[in-house]
């Protein structure tokens, strides 16, 4: 455990200016970001007598291995820089108000030619407009069903849309006039987009104009004696009014505002936000965060004095992330991410700076204030009651989970005689079918919970091939690849740390950030416990690799199937954990997650191999022209017997491409026709190329990329179901 005095900046080197500071752990990972009006005063408070610090603050400073800072000219700049760093580094000791992916929203895919309306749960995407979030999915579907009478927009998936386009008949919704059937050309793309835009305007609060327009059209149809159209418009108006009844007016002055409320205890805080647009509540959102994770001495603050800090942290993180979305994606109400008015229970200490920052994000004046009387005060009290209820329910739900996870980690520590509880556990597993498509997975659990952004998968290169596989050698290969990366990244961090200025300036940018991905180096952070799926041979192989690489601070165990024995290197007998223990359950869950993730990648790799075509390797031949070739000749077998001239008869195929096609199909005539040119064409991309290692990672909207570099579908945060493991994969 580092001693704070070992990295304390020299006396007089910390400036007495406003700025933002970062604490890093010995591995270079940023663990806390904060800002201060006076860096000298704030940082010196961290290096006081450690025994006088609050336990949570003490844990942060003793975990850290270095501190850095950046001086800024104004507090608004400090506010922006602090938000950017928290978003970039995801420090473990900072409070994070993450989107609750379980809240359903109504999504409108404006980035498609024919926009689609559907219920969605997951991270926000650019080019998609969102309305909500709603507390229940059925509420969205009920409202959508009502509005489709008036706005018959597309709701089907891309696959259904293409299928009905091919068969030339609309779906059931098209026959009952709840879809304008753009799939069969009943309306043009422009007409359908206008329907969708009217739908968005209605949900965004611009309802009066739509209702008045419909009433005028109904009156005109009646005067023209078109009573059928008038009756349909009358029903449409009734449907709109029924939908409006579900969003009662709560603020009669047509206010656009967000009302924020908090409920706290000594360890946690719940926050609720009501989004009011046009005087109506358009959405509700809630979070619960652990105050224990922040380096602020919460226990020294009373319930009233900690609220300004919570308000400041929430406003900077929430509106910073909302404004960072593509403006075309929209916010919850389908309009500006920052409303004209933000109502909070108390004003933060730097309310003027935050209000200026919010106004900059919006592009116009934003008011930040506390409601004092009237309807806004009453609604704020309702939001406050919701926050208290959310905190109470959360504590009941999480009490058992937190207790069991703590007991599991402590039980593993005692059973394996570890120096400390294994807060970070990594597990690897191998998957293949009779030695083909051999792959491996690496999953990461922190504090007993999966950290899917750190998941990786691998294609076995040396220990498998030609229909054979050696599980023990595969375990050794993956262990070596993982910890070679660890040593390499750790070496980069150590080398970069030596470049730190004597005055405590920032580390070189390449220290903690991977230049290839722009993200923190994940492999420089080692596990406390490394679990392999297998018994004594597998764990011995992994331990031998760690010894070879000089990794001495990582414990290794193997979890054997069937008897669920825990094997420790160098021990003749396994450790037997009680069948009902939380420790064994956690290890099983980690092992099963690694197994599931490996099988997911194996099936993907096997599917690509089984559906691959020789035409896939032809340079410049895309999917459209491949389809045209097969459609023209009827099959690949007939294509093989064709000549260059016959292939050139297919639209879009020239002589060079035709020659390359015959060369890829391996026909005898190809060599004569192509000569040296065909031999110079690139060969088909093989598994080795497909599985080339990549260190790239992706955002919260996408899944992290794999060590093998071929995509990481299984680790996406939006993944809601576990794939079923079949008997064919092991």
Swiss-Prot record:
It is found in: Cytoplasm. GO terms for biological process: nucleotide-excision repair; SOS response. The keyword Membrane does not apply. Its main location: cytoplasm. One of its GO terms (molecular function) is excinuclease ABC activity. Residues 678-730 are annotated as: Disordered. CDD domains: GIY-YIG_UvrC_Cho. Coiled coil: none annotated. Residues 208-243 form the UVR domain. The keyword DNA repair applies. Interacts with UvrB in an incision complex. Belongs to the UvrC family. This is UvrABC system protein C. The lineage of its organism: Bacteria, Bacillati, Actinomycetota, Actinomycetes, Mycobacteriales.
């Amino acid at each position: 455990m580092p001693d704070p005095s070992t990295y304390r900046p020299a006396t007089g080197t910390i400036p007495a200016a406003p700025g933002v500071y970062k604490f890093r752990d010995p591995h270079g990972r940023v663990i806390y970001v904060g800002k201060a009006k006076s860096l000298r005063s704030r940082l010196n408070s961290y290096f006081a007598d450690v025994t006088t610090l609050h336990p949570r603050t003490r844990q942060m400073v003793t975990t850290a291995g270095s501190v850095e800072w950046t001086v800024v000219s104004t507090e608004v700049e400090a506010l922006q820089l602090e938000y950017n760093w928290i978003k970039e580094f995801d420090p473990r000791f900072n409070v994070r108000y993450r989107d609750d992916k379980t809240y359903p929203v109504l999504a409108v895919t404006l980035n498609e030619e024919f926009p689609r309306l559907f219920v969605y749960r997951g991270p926000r995407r650019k080019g998609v407009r969102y309305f909500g979030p709603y507390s229940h999915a059925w509420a969205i579907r009920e409202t959508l069903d009502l509005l489709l009478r008036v706005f018959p927009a597309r709701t089907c998936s891309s696959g259904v849309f293409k299928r009905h386009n091919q068969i030339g008949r609309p779906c059931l919704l098209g026959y009952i006039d709840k879809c304008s059937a753009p799939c069969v050309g009943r309306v043009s793309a422009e007409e359908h987009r206008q329907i969708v835009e009217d739908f968005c305007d209605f949900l965004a609060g611009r309802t009066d104009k739509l209702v008045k327009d419909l009433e005028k059209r109904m009156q005109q149809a009646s005067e023209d004696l078109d009573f059928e159209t008038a009756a349909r418009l009358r029903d449409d108006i009734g449907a709109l009014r029924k939908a409006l009844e579900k969003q009662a007016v709560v603020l009669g002055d047509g206010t656009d505002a967000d009302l924020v409320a908090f409920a706290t205890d000594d360890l946690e805080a719940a926050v609720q936000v009501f989004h009011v647009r046009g005087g109506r509540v358009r959405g509700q959102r809630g979070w619960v965060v652990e105050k224990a994770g922040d380096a602020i001495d919460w226990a020294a603050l009373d319930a009233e004095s900690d609220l300004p800090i919570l308000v400041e942290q929430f406003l900077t993180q929430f509106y910073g992330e909302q404004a960072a979305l593509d403006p075309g994606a929209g916010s919850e109400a389908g309009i500006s991410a920052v409303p004209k008015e933000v109502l909070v229970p108390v004003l933060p200490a730097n309310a003027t700076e935050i209000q200026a920052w919010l106004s900059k994000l919006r592009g116009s004046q934003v008011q930040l204030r506390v409601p004092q009387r009237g309807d806004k005060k009453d609604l704020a009290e309702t939001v406050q009651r919701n926050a208290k209820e959310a905190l109470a329910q959360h504590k009941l739900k999480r009490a058992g989970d937190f207790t069991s996870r703590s007991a599991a980690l402590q039980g593993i520590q005692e059973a394996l005689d570890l120096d400390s509880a294994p807060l970070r556990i990594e597990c690897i597993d191998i998957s293949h079918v009779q030695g083909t498509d051999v792959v491996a997975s690496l999953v990461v659990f922190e504090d007993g919970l999966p950290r899917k952004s750190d998941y990786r998968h691998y294609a076995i290169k040396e220990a498998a091939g030609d229909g054979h596989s050696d599980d023990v050698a595969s375990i050794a290969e993956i262990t070596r690849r993982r910890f070679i990366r660890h040593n390499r990244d750790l070496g980069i961090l150590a080398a970069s740390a030596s470049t730190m200025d004597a005055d405590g300036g920032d580390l070189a940018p390449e220290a903690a950030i991977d230049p290839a991905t722009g993200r923190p180096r994940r492999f420089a952070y080692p596990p406390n416990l490394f679990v392999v799926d297998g018994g004594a041979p597998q764990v011995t192989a992994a331990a031998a690799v760690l010894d070879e690489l000089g990794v001495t601070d990582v414990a290794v165990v193997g979890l054997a199937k069937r008897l669920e024995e825990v094997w420790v290197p160098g021990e003749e007998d396994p450790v037997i954990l009680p069948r009902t223990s939380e420790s064994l359950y956690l290890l099983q869950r980690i092992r099963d997650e690694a197994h599931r993730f490996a099988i997911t990648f194996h099936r993907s790799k096997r599917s690509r191999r089984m559906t691959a075509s020789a035409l896939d390797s032809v340079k410049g031949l895309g999917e459209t022209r491949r389809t045209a070739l097969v459609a023209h000749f009827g099959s690949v077998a007939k294509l093989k017997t064709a000549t260059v001239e016959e292939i050139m008869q297919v639209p879009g195929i020239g002589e060079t491409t035709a020659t390359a096609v015959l060369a890829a199909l391996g026909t005898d005539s190809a060599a004569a026709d192509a000569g040296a040119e065909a031999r110079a064409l690139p060969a088909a991309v093989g598994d080795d190329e497909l599985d080339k290692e990549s260190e790239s990672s992706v955002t919260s909207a996408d899944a992290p990329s794999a060590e093998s570099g071929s995509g990481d579908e299984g680790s996406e945060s939006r993944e809601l179901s576990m794939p079923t493991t079949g008997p064919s994969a092991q």
